[in-house]
A protein has these predicted regions:
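N-terminal Sec/SRP start-transfer signal
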Residues: 1-36
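Membrane-embedded alpha-helices of multi-pass transport/permease systems
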Residues: 22, 42, 281-302
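Alpha-helical transmembrane segments of integral membrane proteins
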Residues: 23-34, 269-289
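Alpha-helical transmembrane segments
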Residues: 32-59
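Membrane-proximal extracellular/periplasmic loop immediately following the first transmembrane helix
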Residues: 50-101, 107-110, 243
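The feature marks short, hydrophobic/small-residue-biased sequence motifs that occur predominantly
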Residues: 89-132, 190-198
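Basic-flanked hydrophobic alpha-helices used for secretion and membrane insertion
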Residues: 121-124, 137, 148-252
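Peri-transmembrane interface segments
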Residues: 233-282, 294-296, 304
């Protein structure tokens, strides 16, 4: 009962002195206005930039600047790093190519092979993966030139000069999917690492028994000149870059762009909270002083309640 009476008296007093009440509302709006503008800037513009950085896997890619010699033991150790989301070896660029042709097209498409596997950030998470030596995922450009789609079988071939004569080896490849244009804009094919290794071995004159390609037997330990590496998040790129630098591996990343956006986010957050705290304190002091003055002015009226 007392609460209802208090609310009734407060509402009547509020409407009776509507000019003073309107001033309180305007004061609150003056405090909230800049905060809302900064809130929109922080979570709109900067938030959109952060989301773009997070969603684009290219921003998480770490590329070696020059060729090196990386063995399987090195790859096994690097995969244990907390910041590594995806890591596969790369062969020499000149060896990672294959000529593709299909029955639906008269064109022979020279295609770059991209070593891939489970968790490849450039391929859709729910899409097909090249999980076999004869399975590939074509880029949109290559699929259009070959006029093929998922489920089709195409011919792949590679040439070499061996024993003083030119040879060409063929392999039937099954297209298990077509990658989006954003994944790879050129003529390319995502393939199992074993296929990329087999083509390098064939061109170097080594035998590939799994595919029936003859050559010199070589059972020595393999080393790779490069790798495909993606960090688990944009926040892990800088740490991975530093870690690789400690190992003497010079890499190229987009850490500078990531740091710029993150620094903008931190600065706007600091400004936002500083204005919020100062505005809240100022509004509280102003409101308190106004209420104190009103109570003092209405002391006689309040004393008879």
């Amino acid at each position: 009962m007392r609460l209802l009476k208090t609310l009734r008296l407060a509402s009547r007093d509020y409407t009776h002195e509507w000019q003073m009440s309107a001033c309180f509302v305007l004061a609150l709006a003056a405090v909230l206005g800049p905060m809302l503008v900064l809130f929109g800037l922080k979570f709109g513009v900067v938030g959109g930039m952060l989301n773009q950085l997070i969603e684009n896997p290219e921003n998480r890619e770490i590329r070696p600047v020059s060729s090196g010699r990386f063995n399987q033991e090195w790859f096994d150790r690097m995969r244990q790093h907390d910041g590594v989301a995806f890591l596969v070896p790369r062969t020499r660029s000149i060896a990672a190519t294959i000529e593709l042709n299909s029955e639906n097209s008269s064109r022979i498409v020279a295609t770059e092979l991209i070593p891939s596997g489970v968790g490849d950030p450039l391929l859709p998470a729910d899409g097909a993966l090249p999980d076999s030596i004869t399975h590939i995922v074509l880029s949109q450009s290559a699929a259009e030139k070959l006029q093929v789609g998922a489920g089709d079988t195409i011919d792949g071939s590679a040439t070499r000069r061996y024993g003083g004569r030119k040879e060409r080896a063929h392999i039937d490849l099954r297209v298990v999917g077509v990658a989006p244009t954003a994944a790879f804009a050129r003529d390319g094919a995502f393939a199992d690492v074993r296929l990329v290794e087999a083509l390098e071995d064939y061109r170097d004159g080594r035998a590939v028994p799994e595919l029936g390609w003859t050559g010199v037997e070589d059972n020595g330990a393999r080393s790779y000149p490069g790798f495909r590496l993606y960090a688990s998040s944009i926040y892990a790129v800088s740490d991975l870059k530093d870690h690789l630098g400690e190992l003497g591996i010079d890499v190229r990343t987009k850490a500078a762009d990531i740091d710029l956006v993150m620094r903008m986010d931190r600065n706007l957050s600091a400004i936002y909270w500083a204005i919020a705290v100062i505005g809240l304190i100022g509004f509280s002091l102003s409101l308190g002083a106004s209420l104190w003055a009103n109570v003092d002015r209405k002391r006689k009226e309040l004393s008879v309640l």
